[in-house]
Regions:
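Peripheral, non-transmembrane regulatory/ligand-interaction domains of membrane transport proteins
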Residues: 1-238, 291, 321-322
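Hydrophobic alpha-helical transmembrane segments and their immediately adjacent juxtamembrane loops
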Residues: 53, 227-322
Length: 322
């Protein structure tokens, strides 16, 4: 679906135009066209392909979706793919995709499965005509910067979730629920990392070595995006390591609890084994057993059993088994 199609000259909005008028405006000096599509149909993308002479491989990637974040050059056109990540109202992490085609006199952005609008990007860019005057390279930076900035709230939410889980790990009664929550958190971290890591490498092409002509005037701005991605990469690595450690600590706590239960069971088994041993001795059917004929034999036997059990109980209690 077409969101908007606007022509700009010298950094200022020239006119809202129809797709069939694009070819007229891109011919004007110091003018470029910025087209935004959302969940575009095949027909819409193919129409833009003909209008801007886009490379068929890049168009194929934009149509099929589910692409790894990347930045590629096709002649005079720069093609970028980014993944978006955001939480739904039901606290599920969902991903979307933004594809950008940038040429010397046009910018085409296509967003698929992205709930958040990019209209704010256009509004902010139009408030800075001296920057928008730099052309499609600046527009590409503005869109990329907006997508990357939206990673920060997601990472902060993941950090808060991990802090909450860590606080519960050392509480009594460790349960499988904590392991499940940490495992799901690791999956979310991996999802965000799959969006950040490839994009970090891709943006690196725009700030190191040979820079595509479209981005020559905005190289320092892409450096800012690169720095943000580096910070996110570091934060995600730290989160993943902490989550792994949390699982290991959780399993260690579970092992310790099992060991404590085993020690208590072994201690009580030892106490009852001693009592059973005495009862078994005096329960043997021998005719010559002096204790059986003794008047105080029964009370004495009970006393010995009680004393033995008491001593064992004291020793186990002192050792921390009971």
């Amino acid at each position: 679906m077409l969101i908007n199609c606007v022509a700009y000259r010298d950094g200022r909005r020239l006119a809202d135009i129809q797709p069939e008028e694009i070819s007229d405006y891109v011919k004007l000096p110091d003018c470029f066209v910025w087209v935004a599509l959302r969940d575009a149909s095949t027909e819409e993308v193919l129409a833009m392909k003909e209008e801007f002479d886009l490379h068929e491989l890049a168009v194929e990637d934009a149509l099929h979706g589910q692409q790894r974040p990347k930045v590629e050059e096709y002649g005079d056109t720069l093609f970028a793919v980014m993944q978006t990540v955001q939480f739904t109202p039901t606290d599920e992490l969902c991903t979307g995709e933004v594809s950008i085609f940038a040429g010397s006199n046009f910018v085409l952005s296509i967003r698929n499965r992205v709930a958040q609008s990019l209209l704010g990007v256009r509004a902010r860019a139009e408030k800075e005509p001296h920057m928008l005057k730099r052309g499609p390279g600046f527009v590409m930076y503005a869109i990329m910067d907006a997508v990357v900035d939206r990673y920060f709230p997601v990472i902060e939410a993941l950090e808060a979730e991990l802090d909450a889980i860590e606080a519960q790990i050392f509480e009594p009664g460790v349960t499988r629920e904590n392991v499940r929550r940490v495992y799901e958190l690791k999956q979310r971290i991996t999802t965000v990392k799959h969006a950040v890591s490839p994009l970090l490498d891709a943006v690196g092409k725009l700030v190191r070595g040979r820079v595509p002509p479209i981005c020559e005037d905005t190289r320092e701005y892409f450096r800012d995006v690169y720095d943000h991605l580096e910070r996110m990469q570091s934060a995600l690595d730290s989160l993943r390591d902490t989550a792994t450690t949390a699982i290991q600590v959780h399993l260690s706590m579970a092992t310790i609890e099992e060991s404590e239960v085993t020690k208590r069971l072994a201690a009580w088994a030892g106490i009852f084994a001693a009592a059973t041993a005495f009862a078994g001795i005096w329960g043997m059917n021998f005719e010559v057993m002096p204790e059986l004929k003794w008047r105080w034999g029964y009370p004495a036997a009970l006393g010995v059993i009680a004393a033995t059990c008491g001593v064992l109980f004291w020793r186990f209690r002192k050792a921390g088994w009971l």
